[in-house]
UniProtKB/Swiss-Prot annotation, chain A:
Pfam families: GalKase_gal_bdg (PF10509), GHMP_kinases_C (PF08544), GHMP_kinases_N (PF00288). Transmembrane segments: none annotated. GO terms for molecular function: ATP binding; galactokinase activity. GO terms for cellular component: cytoplasm; cytosol; nucleus; transcription regulator complex. The gene is GAL3. The lineage of its organism: Eukaryota, Fungi, Dikarya, Ascomycota, Saccharomycotina. The GAL3 regulatory function is required for rapid induction of the galactose system. At normal induction, galactose in the presence of the GAL3 protein may lead to the induction of the GAL genes, including GAL1. Then the galactokinase protein (GAL1) in the presence of galactose may reinforce the induction leading to a higher expression level. Upon depletion of galactose, the inducing activity of the galactokinase protein may decrease, after which transcription of the GAL genes, including GAL1, may decrease. Disulfide bonds: none annotated. It comes from Saccharomyces cerevisiae (strain ATCC 204508 / S288c). This is Protein GAL3.
Swiss-Prot record, chain B:
To K.lactis GAL80. This is Galactose/lactose metabolism regulatory protein GAL80. One of its GO terms (molecular function) is DNA binding. One of its GO terms (cellular component) is transcription regulator complex. Keywords: Acetylation, Carbohydrate metabolism, DNA-binding, Galactose metabolism, Repressor, Transcription, Transcription regulation. GO terms for biological process: galactose metabolic process; negative regulation of transcription by RNA polymerase II; positive regulation of transcription from RNA polymerase II promoter by galactose; regulation of transcription from RNA polymerase II promoter by galactose. The keyword Hydrolase does not apply. It comes from the Eukaryota. The modification N-acetylmethionine is found at M1.
């Protein structure tokens, strides 16, 4: 596996599939806007998560894949004394933006109180700038970054990793523009710096999106691990006898803007799982480590609790190393402990009850857990969230085990077995993590009734995209699933959709290549 | 939170940027270089610095060179600066003590500039109510849109609190308490601190600035002026000890005539709500308490705003909300109400709103400039938007004007008057006087 972000250049050869048609269009659009040709294009794909939702920020592994839709940033470098960035979006709903770069080499200010599309570019620019200051401090500590004209074009649906792909492409574009053609950045570095990019707009996320976008490989799913070190391992799908494996990605068209709903959804879940980890640690008298390097884990997480528990009670001083058999055993134990600790409070914990469970005052609890990101809630549902995280992590290991060692008597065995895990994941997301919505559930029901073997939400949820495991090829069900979704969901829920919109709402995809550069 | 969404229309206008002339921008020191300049830098498509004035032209020339203001000209006299047609907006960022003597002739000279549309003055407007009223009249006669930097109104926490109150999340307000710490007015004075801020009459003190910004924020959040007030002002620390940068005493005592304590009580016009407020000077005690607390109690919930210093307008606050509100389901745009919303209408909702990376010193001024730009370019496509408006009052949109400043100055004048007379004053007409 190549460890560096790949670079392609003309003449056109071996381009990733999804890029072949689009790069010409974005160059044309760039020329129409700025009347010059771009120097390069930074590309980052969207992603779907096969299984393993909302466990990455607890440092559990996930099984995503990059898909055939992407964010393209075409860039023309400007060598000016007063450098500025001009951003144009192919979608006219997102207005052009222009801002100057600080002349003294300080960081661009990002206002986290405003929901604004160019802020995601600024996040990518910020983390790239931070990286450049580390690798070349004499050059970047006191002088500005170079200016640029940038055209941004994307067909990634909301919920399909759009914001993460944008920050990855923006970071890569910034590094390429400032370090020149011959500089190679490793996938590991790009993933590491972009994993925290969205924190600068107040969105707390875990890094899985960025890892998938960067590490994606054609025809492979990725097994993304966060501990002990961030690592993405491609796994080829099993070779089946009479079918191919395809994924139908159906967009609910419910737009859950991560920034605006974070206080009741995403940010709140992060706090709930953190509080759950600390409540378990208090109950079983173990100390959770504090990871200062990663602001997601300042107060420990559910994986930390698992490791601490096994160190104290099972004499396993070494943290879990990712081994499948050991992991399954430990996760089953964790689920047992969650039942023992939280099942009497399935209706949720008030602030008073949560602080009591942590042996601290309400004021300490509020200061330590609630002021990191905006949040809004009635009760903290520690039982449901902890159970989801551990059981979902268990399903990921079972899925990986299935992909690596199982043999199937018939193709249907694979589809049935893998599909069951996906369906269990959807049930857990809906009932325990409460990140589904009516539209997601409707789409899953319709797909399952018409040929999908596994259907679930993908991405953060609360709208966005769904993913469906469907046999393709001569005997496949892809077209059947598509038609059923159109007739029973889209025509009912969104009767005014145009054919173009329908085409964009349902994507049939195989795994795609990750982030790359295309030199003009 | 609709009010914090950026306009969906372009803020890269097809028209030319607003050309800004500064009185008081110095690259080496001062408030403008820390706040106004970085704010404008983030809005470079909408604002461009084209002129600088300082009594010593060398200061302006050095600033232009250091900041690389390639479009800016240094002017030797106030008259030539004010007369220049290269300026659309003038920003006054100098000591309050000089406001009157600079702004009055500037407005007169500016009659030679047909392009002047905006006058932006730092709070406080001037040293006294009389001066503030004179400036207000002169600006109104000159015919410019005015802005006062009561930038706390643009804080995302204040806007969120205002939103929660206006949408009924705390029901009707029944009481309010404020406690704050005003910083420089205690037993010690840094030797580098400018002398004028410790002398009464220069327009900068615990009442005009610390109390002024905070009480304006309170009125704005609650959408109410006061009906009655009672205040006591103290100068219990008439001498201060000088200290160096490391906090060591220099053995020298200097006089202080500005107040170090304020006790303020009042009732809001809306709902006859009692408000109690105390401010004190001195070194903040970070270990034991917050140095700014605003508590707003309602029939259905409570709001608390906390800050590390008594300057709400430049602090990264934390907003806490706790309360009940029926039929409150968080919905994504266009989403139908879920069958099982997961919210129990009878249970208490808790919200904690804090943005860890928000730089309030620059951010609130930046959002003020953004509002000016939105107004100038009509980025929200408001039909028949007037070219000028008199005051923001309690609107979410727009920006505070000299009329808003004048109303606040009247309240502050009443604080001193109440202290002197030792009586409760009726201030319910404070926003009604015509000039």
């Amino acid at each position: 596996m190549n460890t560096n972000v790949p670079i392609f250049s003309s003449p056109v050869r071996d381009l990733p599939r999804s890029f072949e048609q689009k790069h010409l269009a974005v160059v044309d659009a760039f020329f129409q806007t700025y009347h010059v040709k771009p120097d390069f294009i930074a590309r980052s794909p969207g992603r779907v998560n096969l299984i393993g939702e909302h466990i990455d920020y607890c440092d559990f592994s996930v099984l995503p894949l990059a898909i055939d839709v992407d964010m393209l940033c075409a860039v023309k470098i400007l060598d000016e004394k007063n450098p500025s960035i001009t951003l144009t979006n192919a979608d006219p709903k997102f207005a052009q933006r222009k801002f100057d770069l600080p002349l003294d080499g300080s960081y661009m200010a990002i206002d986290p109180s405003v929901s604004e599309w160019s802020n995601y570019f600024k996040c990518g620019l910020h983390v790239a700038h931070s990286y450049l200051k580390k690798i070349a401090p004499e050059r970047f500590n006191n002088t500005p970054l170079v200016g640029a004209q940038i055209f941004c074009q994307s067909d990634i649906p909301t919920g399909g990793g759009l914001s993460s792909a944008f920050t990855c492409a923006a970071a890569l574009a910034t590094i390429r523009a400032n370090m020149g053609k011959n500089f190679d950045i490793s996938k590991k570095d790009l993933t590491r710096i972009t994993a925290v990019a969205e924190h600068y707009v107040g969105v707390n996320n875990g890094g899985m999106d960025q890892a998938t976008s960067v590490y994606g490989e054609e025809d492979h799913a990725l097994y993304v691990e966060f501990r002990p070190k961030l690592k993405a391992t491609p796994f080829k799908f099993p070779q089946l006898k009479n079918h191919e494996i395809s994924f139908v990605i159906a967009n609910t068209l419910v737009k859950s803007n991560k920034f605006e709903t974070a206080p009741t959804n995403y940010n709140l879940r992060v706090i709930e799982v953190t509080v759950a980890a600390n409540a378990l640690a208090t109950r079983y008298s173990v100390a959770l480590p504090s990871h200062k390097d990663n602001s997601n884990s300042e107060r420990g997480n559910l994986r930390d609790f698992m490791d601490a528990y096994y160190a104290r009670y099972e004499n396993q001083a070494q943290p879990w190393n990712g081994d499948i058999g050991t992991g399954i055993e430990r996760l089953l134990k964790m689920l047992q402990l969650v039942e023992e600790s939280f099942s009497r409070k399935k209706s949720g914990f008030t602030v008073h009850e949560a602080s009591t469970a942590l042996n601290c005052s309400r004021e300490e609890f509020t200061r330590d857990y609630l002021t990191t990101f905006p949040v809004r809630f009635q009760v903290l549902k520690l039982y449901q969230r902890a159970k989801h995280v551990y059981s979902e992590s268990l399903r990921v290991l079972k899925a990986l085990k299935m992909m690596t060692s199982a043999t199937f008597h018939t193709d249907e065995d694979f589809f049935t077995d893998f599909g069951r895990l996906m369906n269990e994941s959807q049930a857990s997301c809906d009932k325990l993590y409460e990140c589904s919505c009516i539209e997601t559930n409707q789409i899953c029901s319709i797909a399952l009734a018409n040929g999908s073997f596994g259907s679930r939400l993908t991405g953060a949820g609360w709208g966005g995209c769904t993913i469906h495991l469907v046999p393709s090829g001569a005997n496949g069900n892809v077209e059947q699933v598509r038609k059923a979704l159109i007739e029973k969901f889209y025509n009912v829920r969104y009767p005014d959709l145009t054919d173009e919109e329908l085409k964009d709402a349902i994507i049939v995809s195989k795994p795609a290549l990750g982030t790359c550069l295309y030199e003009q | 939170m609709d009010y914090n969404k950026r306009s969906s229309v372009s803020t890269v206008p097809n028209a030319a940027p607003i050309r800004v002339g500064f009185v008081g921008l110095n690259a080496a020191k001062g408030w403008a270089i820390k706040t106004h300049y970085p704010a404008i830098l983030q809005l470079s498509s909408q604002f461009q610095i084209t002129a600088l004035y300082s009594p010593k032209i060398e200061t302006s020339i050095a600033t232009i060179q250091r900041l690389k203001l390639s479009n800016a000209t240094a002017f030797p006299t106030l008259e030539s600066f004010a007369s220049s047609s290269t300026i659309d907006m003038i920003v006054i960022a100098i000591q309050v003590a000089s406001h009157y003597e600079v702004v009055m002739p500037l407005l007169e000279f500016s009659k030679n500039n047909p392009n002047l549309k905006y006058l932006f003055v730092e709070w406080a407007l001037a040293c006294s109510l009389d001066q503030a009223e004179s400036i207000y009249k002169a600006a109104a006669e000159r015919g410019v849109q005015t802005i006062i930097s009561l930038q706390g109104r643009k804080s995302p926490y204040i806007l969120r609190a205002k939103e929660l109150i206006s949408q009924g999340y705390i029901g009707d307000i029944n009481s309010i308490e404020i406690a704050g710490n005003g910083g420089w007015y205690g037993y010690e004075r840094p030797v580098k601190s400018p002398k004028y801020i410790y002398e009464i009459g220069n327009g900068v003190d615990l009442v005009t600035t610390t109390f002024g910004h905070t009480i304006d924020i309170l009125q704005y959040m609650t959408s109410s002026y006061f009906s009655r007030i009672n205040a006591m002002v103290f100068n219990n620390i008439p001498e201060q000890e000088l200290i160096d940068e490391r906090g060591n005493r220099l053995g020298q005592r200097v006089p202080k005539t500005v107040p170090d304590h304020l006790l303020f009580q009042g009732t809001l016009l809306n709902g006859n709500v009692p408000v109690s407020c105390s401010f004190k000077g001195g070194k903040p005690t970070k270990k034991f308490t917050k140095n700014l607390v605003i508590d707003i109690h309602g029939t259905k919930g409570d709001l608390k705003l906390e800050g590390d210093a008594g300057f709400a307008e430049i602090s990264n606050l934390v907003l806490y909300y706790s309360g009940t509100r029926a039929n409150d389901f968080p919905l994504a745009n266009g989403q139908q109400a879920p069958l099982d919303p997961g919210y129990d209408a009878g249970k208490e909702i808790m919200e904690v709103y804090h943005l860890r990376n928000y730089n309030a010193i620059v951010g609130n001024i930046h959002r003020l400039y953004q509002s000016i730009s939105d107004f100038h370019f009509n980025t929200k496509k408001i039909p028949e938007l007037p070219s000028q408006f008199v005051m923001q009052g309690f609107d979410f949109e727009g920006f505070p004007t000299l009329m808003d400043a004048l109303i606040l100055h009247r309240l502050i004048e009443s604080v001193y008057k109440s202290n002197m007379m030792g009586s409760t004053l009726n201030v319910s007409n404070i926003s009604h006087y015509s000039l």
